[in-house]
Amino acid sequence: MRLEELKRLQNPLEQVNDGKYSFENHQLAMDAENNIEKYPLNLQPLESKVKIIQRAWREYLQRQEPLGKRSPSPPSVSSEKLSSSVSMNTFSDSSTPDYREDGMDLGSDAGSSSSSSRASSQSNSTKVTPCSECKSSSSPGGSLDLVSALEDYEEPFPVYQKKVIDEWAPEEDGEEEEEEDERDQRGYRDDRSPAREPGDVSARTRSGGGGGRSATTAMPPPVPNGNLHQHDPQDLRHNGNVVVAGRPSCSRGPRRAIQKPQPAGGRRSGRGPAAGGLCLQPPDGGTCVPEEPPVPPMDWEALEKHLAGLQFREQEVRNQGQARTNSTSAQKNERESIRQKLALGSFFDDGPGIYTSCSKSGKPSLSSRLQSGMNLQICFVNDSGSDKDSDADDSKTETSLDTPLSPMSKQSSSYSDRDTTEEESESLDDMDFLTRQKKLQAEAKMALAMAKPMAKMQVEVEKQNRKKSPVADLLPHMPHISECLMKRSLKPTDLRDMTIGQLQVIVNDLHSQIESLNEELVQLLLIRDELHTEQDAMLVDIEDLTRHAESQQKHMAEKMPAK
């Protein structure tokens, strides 16, 4: 009875124990993963040490290959210590792929081909040759188990680890330097070296003097997602192996100089930058850029004084130019005011309506012409004798007073005889200055008053002298049409009585008249401009002569009391 109860209770107890053990195993696995994720910095040195031990084991297998045929007994190693350290390479991480996909199975390391591993380590020292899962034909015992092969090794693990690291680090550095020497001899100076193969795990940097520490320990610590560089987007990962993107070969010297100072006697110390200058390495991997020398200090006070002096000079030049323009504009305004007084005040004090009536015919006023900005200095060339006479004696000044009136006398010759004008000019010699001025102004007023009716009479004479329209010959029974054409007014009733041919003749005649009138208008406009220029010249001459005459009169009046 008791045996049955014991057996019956033993089954649930075994089940409970199995469940408890499985739960504890699962909890231990979860704790291991959590510790790996929480403390990623501690795994990187172990991983590098495991790789070094793995290479040492391959080298040992290669050395023991000839001895294995005679004595196939492998050296004994503490399986618990070595297997635990080797198995750290395949730690469980959720984001890290399994190294077994690339053939990095530590259990099959013993069965890898020794010749292929040695050849790959010599050809490219920066590569970790993936282990093949196939059995090597050269191995005497086939695939060897790493744990079972190293059971009886009595040397402590830390001592063995240190010895292996010290043994392999100089060899790797020597192989790296030999490889770089070969690249330099081949002229390998490409700006961007090709990416390493998928089997590459570590990106080494060549040490300056060939120190006793491997460059793989200088790698940055891995992050939980398995990438070696946390912020480097150029790190690639193929099948769980890290492939560092290619970098320019010319920048290896400066990078090594930054990571580790080079000794003075290093044989590769010449590859760094020059000793006299500072070489800055750009982040994109370009060529070394020497630092520019500092800019010399500026003397800001002297510069400000120089600028202030330049501004003061510019201001003085502007003030002088403005003063000149103001003086010239004042002189021009004074002369224009005098001309306006002479034209409007003295000529038309009694009858300003005469000039205004003349202006209605389309002729611009004198004041507007004087203010139109015409160059009046050219007008002095028209009558240069007046200037010469004004500088002469009193008798010559009296004769010069008659010179501006010569065009007036020519203009008035149509309605007065020359004898009368000559007698009047002779009688002016005996008159006083004021009386002569008044008489000349009266003559000018009369000439201006006679200008408009004389112009109308001349226009009527020109109209009568024109040829009759050829329409009068085509339309003898309609004489009024030719008159209407001359007056440029036709009635619709007259046009209805005409044929198409007659209308075409009238149209052609009108076109020809328009062309002839346009040509005549152009000629008349040119004549008008010339007359305006001549009139302005006369006014300027009158102004100058009036001033000169007044000065002479004052001079004579001062001499008379002195006598």
UniProtKB/Swiss-Prot annotation:
Bias-annotated ranges (Low complexity): 76-87, 108-143
Positions of the UniProt region annotated as Disordered: 63-150, 164-295, 312-336, 384-430
Expression across tissues: Highly expressed in brain and to a lower extent in heart and kidney.
Domain (IQ): residue spans on this chain: 47-67
Cellular localisation: Cell projection, Axon; Cytoplasm
GO biological process: negative regulation of cytoskeleton organization; positive regulation of hippo signaling
Residues bearing PTM Phosphoserine: S193
Segments of skewed composition (Polar residues): 88-97, 318-331, 400-411
Residue ranges with Acidic residues bias: 168-182, 420-430
GO cellular component, one term: plasma membrane
Alphabetized UniProt keyword annotations: Cell projection, Coiled coil, Cytoplasm, Phosphoprotein
Compositional bias per record (Basic and acidic residues), positions renumbered to this chain: 183-199, 229-238, 385-399
Entry keyword annotation includes Coiled coil: yes
Annotated segments matching region Required for interaction with ankyrins: 419-563
Pfam families attached to this UniProt entry: IQCJ-SCHIP1, SCHIP-1_C
Major site of localization recorded for this protein: other
Coiled coil: 500-534
Xref: InterPro entries: IQCJ-SCHIP1_N (IPR029362), SCHIP_1 (IPR039045), SCHIP_1_C (IPR015649)
PANTHER family assigned to the protein according to its UniProt record, in alphabetical order: IQCJ-SCHIP1 READTHROUGH TRANSCRIPT PROTEIN-RELATED, SCHWANNOMIN INTERACTING PROTEIN 1
Quaternary structure and partners: Homooligomer (via coiled coil domain). Interacts (via IQ domain) with calmodulin; the interaction is direct and lost in presence of calcium. Interacts with ANK3 (via ANK repeats); required for localization at axon initial segments (AIS) and nodes of Ranvier. Interacts with SPTBN4. Interacts with KCNQ2 and KCNQ3.
Summary of the function given for this chain in its UniProt record: May play a role in action potential conduction in myelinated cells through the organization of molecular complexes at nodes of Ranvier and axon initial segments. May also play a role in axon outgrowth and guidance.
Descriptive protein name: IQCJ-SCHIP1 readthrough transcript protein
Organism listed in the record: Homo sapiens (Human)
Lineage: Eukaryota, Metazoa, Chordata, Craniata, Vertebrata
